Every structure is written in structure tokens, then in C-alpha cells.
């Protein structure tokens, strides 16, 4: 997915359609206590319900598990002797306690087994640790020493990261700058920032855009992480505050393009009308944008015969796709019946910005196909190949997201 994120469906107060761009990714964060209210009883129904709501809106789901915020870690876990300290936003548990680690691995395994290969999951944010699952202790004002003692050792940070890499192996992952981002990125994860747009939000002397993110990106493995995992940003404050404070929007958005942004969490708060045109242009460029430059194919074939299809594509976005979405072709009869369909072995995840490698496929026409003239359509499908999934930047779109491009004669 790409574009603006639908953050918790607007927490019951979603912006009107004219106030917020169209969304294809819903982003939810859940405390462990909600996901496993009783030991070993996982609340899959909660996630499934949100997936169904997201699907009804044409969205896939991105998730983060947190263990500190609000209800945080389950009381039954703390009752097993896991130390904790109350702080401003929740309860900070002892991340080094063997019982915490044992049960947290079980949790990630259970949710990975349930959702790790789901076509309904866009990406998983490697959270779990620290304030809001953001790998820090900034919520620990007044109890810094206890939080520091409870913060996981480097070995335990890597262990927890490994559980996400293992149990969500088929799912795009992102990790906040800090923590074990270098380690996660070296294993295919993308990265996220949580204060996008900050060029002086908190201080005239220090800001995230110049002083927090660029040093992180000096690590080549993180700077290149976008080639294998998504870059997801969360706006600093709210966009209407940027507008009121006179922020340089073009500077902010251009930096997002340079960082190969795919998803922007604008917290489901209205975008100022005066800025909508600039955001609309920005949204045409973030993530992927596939243009079919040329398609050549056999003009005719026969039942059981070959059909040669050659195509040239260009990705006009700033990032690839991160799911194994296949390129597909089909033949359609004059009565709109799909009479043949094929998927290409081409790996579209390799289609970085710019011209893509030439795709050459030879498919076999079904033996049973009657002679006649057939429409040739193309699409990029979902992982399970059940439906067309990707909007292409070309003409010819049909209601089912396939694109009618040409005709083939079967003799």
C-alpha cells in the first residue's frame, strides 16, 4: 500500500472525504493486554474485525504491538513476577525478565502464524519495546532509572527483532529509527520516522528532519532499506498546525520523496484546503506508480498454441512494491467472459524507480478455446492472484481494475 494512512479510522471522528486524501492503508496500534487478555487466549477477533472494516474501505492493515502504552502488558503477565513501573502514559515492564520474553515470543509467534502471510496485512511495525512501542524511554519522566534498568539489553533487543523477522517472514516490516534499525534493515526491514515535517517544531536549535534522520541514514544499509522494505512516516503534530505556523511545505514534501516514502500517517486529521493540491501532487509520486510504456504480442494464435507477450514498464514513483504481487494477462470474449488467464514469473518487487527490465512471457492458449477475436487485458494482482490489486497509471481501466489494451485473434 501507499499514500496517506487511515489512523485507527479517525478514532471515531474520521475527517470528511474532502478533508483527507483517499487511503489504502489502515494503521492500528494495540496494547498486548488487548491482544492477549487472558494467558494463551489471543484476541484475533479484534484484529479480524478491523481487517473486515478496512477491506470495506478498500484498505489493507498495518499494525504495531505495544507493551507499555495505556493498558500495556497484561496484568496476568505482571502477576507472574515481571517487574514494572508506572509512568506518564502507562506501565513500563521489565523487558529483560525471562517470563516477559517467553510470553512475548509466544504472542508474536501466534500473530505471525495467523497474519504473517495474510493478503490483508500491508506491513508490520516492529514495536513491542519502550514508550508507545517506539524503542525509547521518553515517557519515563521521574522514573528514568527504573525504565533504564527495565529497557532490554542489546541481546534481548536483537532477540525480539528476530521474532518479527522469523514469524512475519512473508510480511513487509518497518522499524523506527533507533533501537535495532540497522540490524532489522540488514534483514530486509524498512524504516519509519515519527516526527516527519519537524524543521523547528520543538526547538530552533534541533529538529528531526535535519538532526535525527540524516545521521541514521549515513548507514548505507538504512539509506538503501527502501529497496526492500517500506518507508513509513508519521507527521509531527498535525498538518493543520504546520499550516498555521507557516512551515515550508515544499521543503518537507521534497524530503519525503528523497527518502523514498511509501506511507504517510497524517493521523487522520484534516489537511488544509489551501494545501490539498500540493498534497495531491505529492501523492502521485510517493510509493510506486507503474506506467506500461509498450506492449507487443502475437497478433494471432491457435488453441494449444503459444502467445508471446513482451512489455516495457516504468515506475514513476519513488519506491517499489513490497509484496509479491504478480503481473497477469487474460483473454476476454465478446460476452465479457474470461476464457484464459496467466501470471508472469516477473518479480515486480525489483521494479525500482525508473525503467523496469523488459518482461517477456510466452503463454499457452487453452486447447478448448474457440476461434474468434478476444480482448487482451493486463493487471497486477494481489498475492493470492484472486483479484486485480494495483491501479496503473495508464488508460483502459475496467471496473475490476484490469486494463483493456489490445485484441488477439484465435484461428
Task: Give, region by region, the residue ranges found by the protein language model.
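Substrate-binding cleft/loops of secretory-pathway carbohydrate-active enzymes
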Residues: 125-162, 167-226
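Extended substrate-binding grooves/exosites of carbohydrate-active enzymes
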Residues: 266-291
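Active-site cradle of extracellular carbohydrate-active enzymes
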Residues: 64-74, 120-128, 160
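Non-catalytic accessory regions flanking glycosidase/transglycosidase catalytic cores in CAZymes
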Residues: 1-27, 32-56, 60, 106, ...
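An active-site-proximal structural segment forming one wall of the substrate-binding cleft
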Residues: 50-55, 84-125, 155-163
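Short catalytic/ligand-binding loop motif for oxyanion handling, primarily in non-cytosolic enzymes
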Residues: 35-36, 69-76, 130-136, 181-185, ...
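N-terminal substrate-binding region of glycoside hydrolase catalytic domains
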Residues: 1-99, 198, 223-274
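Extracellular/luminal regions of secreted and cell-surface proteins that mediate adhesion/ECM remodeling
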Residues: 283-411
Amino acid at each position: 500500500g501507499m499514500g496517506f494512512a487511515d489512523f485507527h479510522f479517525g478514532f471515531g471522528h474520521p475527517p470528511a472525504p474532502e478533508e483527507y486524501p483517499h487511503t489504502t492503508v489502515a494503521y492500528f496500534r494495540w496494547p498486548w493486554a488487548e491482544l492477549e487478555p487472558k494467558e494463551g487466549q489471543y484476541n484475533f477477533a479484534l484484529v479480524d474485525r478491523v481487517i473486515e472494516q478496512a477491506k470495506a474501505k478498500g484498505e489493507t492493515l498495518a499494525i504495531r504491538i505495544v507493551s507499555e502504552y495505556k493498558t500495556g502488558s497484561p496484568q496476568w503477565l505482571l502477576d507472574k513476577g515481571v517487574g514494572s513501573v508506572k509512568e506518564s502514559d502507562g506501565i513500563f515492564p521489565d523487558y529483560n525478565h525471562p517470563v516477559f520474553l517467553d510470553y512475548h515470543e509466544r504472542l508474536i509467534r501466534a500473530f505471525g502464524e495467523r497474519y504473517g502471510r495474510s493478503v490483508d496485512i500491508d506491513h508490520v511495525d516492529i514495536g513491542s519495546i519502550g514508550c508507545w512501542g517506539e524503542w525509547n524511554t521518553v515517557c519515563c519522566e521521574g522514573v528514568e532509572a527504573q525504565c533504564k534498568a527495565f529497557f532490554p539489553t542489546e541481546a534481548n533487543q536483537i532477540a525480539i527483532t528476530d521474532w518479527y523477522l522469523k514469524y512475519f517472514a512473508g510480511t513487509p516490516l518497518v522499524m523506527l529509527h533507533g533501537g535495532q534499525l540497522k540490524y532489522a534493515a540488514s534483514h530486509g526491514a524498512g524504516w519509519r520516522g515519527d516526527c516527519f515535517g519537524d524543521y523547528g517544531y520543538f526547538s530552533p536549535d534541533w529538529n528531526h528532519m535535519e538532526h535525527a534522520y540524516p545521521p541514521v541514514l549515513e548507514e548505507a544499509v538504512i539509506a538503501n532499506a527502501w529497496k526492500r522494505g517500506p518507508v513509513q512516516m508519521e507527521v509531527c503534530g498535525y498538518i493543520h498546525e504546520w499550516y498555521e505556523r507557516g512551515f515550508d511545505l515544499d521543503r518537507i514534501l521534497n524530503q519525503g520523496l528523497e527518502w523514498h516514502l511509501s506511507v504517510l500517517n497524517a493521523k487522520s486529521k484534516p489537511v488544509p484546503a489551501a494545501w490539498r493540491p500540493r498534497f495531491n501532487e505529492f501523492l502521485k509520486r510517493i510509493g510506486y506508480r507503474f506506467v506500461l510504456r509498450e506492449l507487443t504480442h502475437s497478433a494471432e494464435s491457435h488453441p494449444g498454441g503459444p502467445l508471446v507477450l513482451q512489455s516495457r514498464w516504468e515506475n514513476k514513483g519513488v519506491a517499489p512494491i513490497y509484496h509479491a504481487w504478480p503481473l497477469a494477462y487474460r483473454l476476454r470474449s465478446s460476452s465479457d467472459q474470461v476464457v484464459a488467464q496467466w501470471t508472469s514469473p516477473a518479480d515486480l518487487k525489483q521494479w525500482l524507480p525508473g525503467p523496469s527490465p523488459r518482461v517477456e512471457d510466452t503463454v499457452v492458449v487453452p486447447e478448448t478455446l474457440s476461434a474468434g477475436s478476444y480482448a487482451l487485458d493486463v493487471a497486477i494482482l494481489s498475492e493470492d492472484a484472486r483479484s486485480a490489486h494495483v491501479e496503473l497509471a495508464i488508460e483502459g481501466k475496467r471496473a475490476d481494475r484490469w486494463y483493456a489494451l489490445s485484441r488477439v485473434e484465435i484461428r
